[in-house]
């Protein structure tokens, strides 16, 4: 291997090595599963959109919304199917963020006559590349 090829190889190796050592930022990934129906029937799409715009967007600093078809069974064995909205929210682990999420869930439950909202929290490392 001539010196030019070796120099190019070394340069590429150093660049890739530096890239592989990017700092990982520890965050919390919260998933919120909102059922979009209640005892009166499906929650109108316009009502969900208004709640999302007026409450969620003013509470969380950013999120991703996914839509799904949910299935669940209550304690007596009765089965239910409903549309759902899933919010994914990446945030710093803090009491303030926990309070914001708890407040959002409480407001949703009151406004749409819901028993619960499923919440899943995971510690994650995030990277912007």
Model-derived segments and spans:
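Bacterial Sec-dependent N-terminal signal peptides
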Residues: 1-22
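Positively charged, small/polar-rich N-terminal and surface patches that mediate targeting and assembly
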Residues: 18-129
């Amino acid at each position: 291997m001539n010196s030019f090829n070796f120099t190019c190889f070394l340069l590429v190796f150093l660049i890739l090595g530096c890239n592989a050592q990017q700092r990982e930022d520890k965050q919390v990934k919260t998933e919120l599963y909102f059922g979009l129906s209640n005892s009166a029937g499906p929650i109108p799409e316009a009502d969900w959109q208004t709640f999302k715009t007026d409450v969620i967007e003013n509470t969380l600093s950013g999120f991703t919304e996914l839509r799904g078809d949910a299935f669940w069974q209550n304690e007596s064995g009765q089965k239910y199917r409903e549309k759902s909205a899933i919010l994914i929210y990446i945030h710093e682990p803090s009491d303030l963020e926990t309070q914001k999420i708890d407040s959002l869930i409480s407001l949703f439950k009151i406004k749409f006559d819901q028993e619960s909202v499923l919440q899943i929290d995971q510690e994650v490392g995030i990277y912007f590349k």
